[in-house]
Amino acid sequence: MLSRRLAILLLLAAAPALAQPATLSGFADEGVFHLYMNEDRLGSIKFRWQADGSFESESTISMAGQSVTIVMTIAPDREGRFARIESKSPQGTVVTVREGNVARRTFKEKTETVTIKPDARLFGNYAPPLMSQAVRLYDRAKGGKQAFPLLIIPGVMMEASLEFKDKIERTVAGRDIEFLRFVYGVPGVDITVWVDSEGKLYFADVPAQRAAFVRDGYEALRQVPETDPLLSPAKYEIKLERGVGVPMRDGVRLATDIYRPEAEGKFPVILVRTPYKKEMAELQARFYTRRGYAFAVQDCRGRFGSAGVWQPFMREPEDGYDTIEWLAGQPWSTGKVGMIGGSYVGWVQWWAASRRPPHLVTIIPNVAPPDPLYNVPYEYGVFFMTGGIWWADVLETQATADLSGVALSKVLEKKYKKLLAPLPVIELDKAVLGKENPYWREWIRHPPHDRYWTPANFLDRLKDVRIPVFHQSGWFDGDGIGSKLNYLRMASHGHPNQKLVLGPWGHTDTAGRRIGDRDFGPQAIIDLQRDYLRWFDYWLKGVENGIAKEPLVAIFVMGSNQWLRGNVYPLPVTRFEKWHLAEGGKLTSEIPPAGAPPDRYTYDPADPTPDPRFYEETEEEEKTVRSAEDKKKEREAYHEKVTRERRDILVYATEPLAKPLTFAGPVSATLYASSSARDTDWFVRLLEVEKDGKIFPLAMGKVRARYRRSMKKPELLKRGRVYEYQLDLWQTGITIPAGHRLRVEVASASFPMFSRNLNTGGHNEMETRHVPAQQVIHHGRQYPSHVLLPVIPETELKR
């Protein structure tokens, strides 16, 4: 018995110590950091870090007449490792408590656990001094890029890196100081940090985000003279007129903030028209005004400070025209007007341009949709239900005007699968918004072929819109079809100076390098703000900065992580290849033989096919304590779980590719299908499947069958007849490596993102009666269903 006890004790002694985060003790610092965006101070962080490892900070961010304060405290254990982190903000209090290598994060009565990796460092978005912890643990003797686990407060484990860059001496506050500079690699962004010999942080620069943290008294570290001769320098002070009432043709006045250089003379004008509160654009306005532009920010009709009734889409063409011409006629204006902005703020540019105001010189519509029939609120006849009601909720709660994020967080917390399940769809505004919403109901009462939409459709008006346009979007932009359709329509009319930039980004006007767990490298981050300024400098000021001599088109290829450039889109080297749906769930570049049996499934609106990408925890699941790792695995496995368990999703896949396949540009699909219904929907997804089975979505298209020929003249189906359907799968750019598979999925619903087709031929959003549909997908030589890929020859890629 004694020997057995001794053996157990020896085993315990030999076991490795429980994995612990890195210590915070043995270092002390306190002071104030200031947060800058471009030249503007956005906030301050007051902090105190004590030698026992305790840390406290108070961060205050101020913008648009609002201030938000975030208070954080870190309490250490006896070894100086964090034991408890508490973060208080207007959204609530998050508490992270560690026991050994497991931390429990609690927010709004929801708790999840996080496994802390050995020697994990801490990082806080508004606690820059914490970066000193990683710097002090850096092995200078070893050098190079050193990886380490990072706990991003309040409790997300990531991998980060730190690399010594150089030493630099600067004179600050009357004394010479030698700084060590490191590149701190946080997932998706690199931060250049300046520290002293003890590891104390003085300056943290985030070039990709135009942001910087600088210690109070050391502002000289970020005051680097503008040396780019191709850009207008930031040399002007700013004067601001708030709430100027710009008159419209019907007498309504729209509230407009006008920023102007504090100087004599006339200046070109940049206009932003927004439904999201004009004050929220003040940082952008100040950036351009310092560089010699008058900048006007206007609340759209019926929004915030502007008079009139808010009705999305409908009055924007005339209001945009009238505002442009009013600005051009002001005594401080050169008469040249440009526009910029993303999403709806990009949309209003197209509406204004379609009316050809004489003084509109150029536009930069970032991530802008096309006509409302091809994206929001309809996409080729299919009603974008979640997108439409979510946007209405954001507008009605004025969530975009709330700097604290409280209003938006309430919108995002809603459980859409449950809320959007009842019929009819038109009544869902009551469930989500708590009341009837006039424009939600207008969208539904007027289907795509209704003349109601004529004032909002601009694509057919672009023939005579001969202005230079800077189109910008991303492969994962939820409005990305706009950059495709808008660019292609302008190009089809032969309009010159159509610049197009498509990167591995989402719905944003800035560049990033990550989507989910995929990192596309530093090549993906380009300085778009610099390019926008150069564009305006050339077209509004006549500055010969070379932008007109550069290739007009730049598209990013994921996987090979490089840019391809040319002057037209698709690129001239593009070779369109058909990849065919075939018997047995195969996807092949060869035309399948004739006589293959079709594939069949039943689509039942009573149990609508779920969107495999719409993962949402139920309220009961949220109350269950689970690990963040398990939740992540469940989210990642959800797509495959849905396609495996459902019988109403057809899957076609290639064999593992023998060699890499690169395609970049517009994607489409052709389906030959029949249905027992008078009307139904078709959805096609394109995906990459990694060696381990993980799915990476690339593109999706959809069409409501009655609109297969025309958006203006719907035609119901004849039951059982085979029809050809053309589906627009938007666009993407990627190299699929050898060993991975290409996959196509076909379904007839994508709930709750899009409203279900009831299969009756009636009004799908105003009726409740529904019937199942027997769906048949044909393939083979007679009915060659396929996806069309814009293949790029391997020789065009950089080695």
Please identify what each model-predicted range represents.
Residues 410-427, 501, 517-799:
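C-terminal, loop-rich substrate-recognition/catalytic regions characterized by aromatic stacking residues
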Residues 228-265, 653-659:
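N-terminal cap/lid segment of alpha/beta-hydrolase-fold proteins
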Residues 26-28, 42, 91-179, 198, ...:
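Solvent-exposed helix/loop surface patches that form functional interfaces
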Residues 36-109, 199, 204, 363:
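N-terminal mature ectodomain segment of secretory-pathway/periplasmic proteins
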Residues 146-148, 290, 351-464:
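Accessory cap/linker subdomain of secreted extracellular hydrolases
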Residues 332-344:
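Alpha/beta-hydrolase fold nucleophile elbow
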Residues 261-329, 378, 511-520, 644, ...:
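Cap/lid segment of the alpha/beta-hydrolase catalytic domain
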Residues 465, 471-473:
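Short beta-strand/loop motif that positions the catalytic acidic residue
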